[in-house]
Regions:
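Short S/T/G/P-rich N-terminal loop/turn motif that feeds into the first structured element of a domain
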Residues: 1-202
Length: 202
């Protein structure tokens, strides 16, 4: 088990944010977090345009201490100020499973609610879904649950990275049409609550 914290921002000057991120923000983040990457929501309803910065941690304590350290980093503070960035939310996610890598031009995020899922049932679902996704251009997937996130607490998430969303969504359609997936939803009283499509910021 590992954890991620997701910082969501509204950014007035995206070019300045990206410049600051590349000049110092990413490097400063990697001094305290295991991994970090940023994305911009493109197809996301009322969230369109928001920036998300994803930090990977070994523990909740590391996430708590790391966030405090990053909020006091002079370079990061300057980037946030210069780009007119405003914090929208920060959530903590328990990562239950990962497949593949984290690289890709795009990121999709599916959210759902359901009854509690036994580890063995989740592992079987992860492997079944990844087998299809990996054949349709998926570079990697991360499954988890929001542990602290206001009204989103308890929500399950599935993040997928890919270089083509057209190809990826063909795989998603195959999964959703399968009897196995429909049975999984029925067994766990699961309901999809949202999907966002984002581009990675480099």
């Amino acid at each position: 088990v590992s954890y991620i914290s997701s910082l969501t921002l509204k950014v007035a000057d995206l070019e300045r944010f990206i410049t600051g991120w590349n000049d110092s923000g990413k490097e400063a983040s990697l001094r305290v977090a295991n991994d970090v990457w940023a994305s911009q929501a493109i197809m996301a309803g009322e969230r369109a345009g928001e920036i998300s910065v994803i930090y990977h941690w070994d523990s909740i304590d590391a996430a708590m201490d790391g966030v405090v350290a990053l909020r006091n980093d002079p370079g990061i503070l300057k980037t946030l100020s210069d780009s007119g960035s405003e914090t929208v939310r920060r959530v903590l996610v328990r990562v239950d499973a990962e497949r593949g890598g984290r690289n890709g031009k795009y990121v999709t995020l599916l959210t759902s609610i359901s009854d509690p899922i036994a580890p063995e049932a989740q592992t079987a679902a992860v492997d079944r879904v990844w087998e299809v996704v990996s054949r349709h251009g998926g570079n990697g997937q991360m499954w988890g649950q929001i542990l602290a996130g206001g009204p989103m607490t308890g929500t399950y998430i599935l993040a997928t990275t890919a270089d083509s969303l057209d190809t990826l969504l063909e795989g998603t359609a195959e999964i959703m049409a399968s009897t196995e997936q429909q049975q999984y939803f029925a067994d766990h009283n699961a309901t999809l609550t949202g999907r966002t499509m984002s581009r990675r910021l480099e």
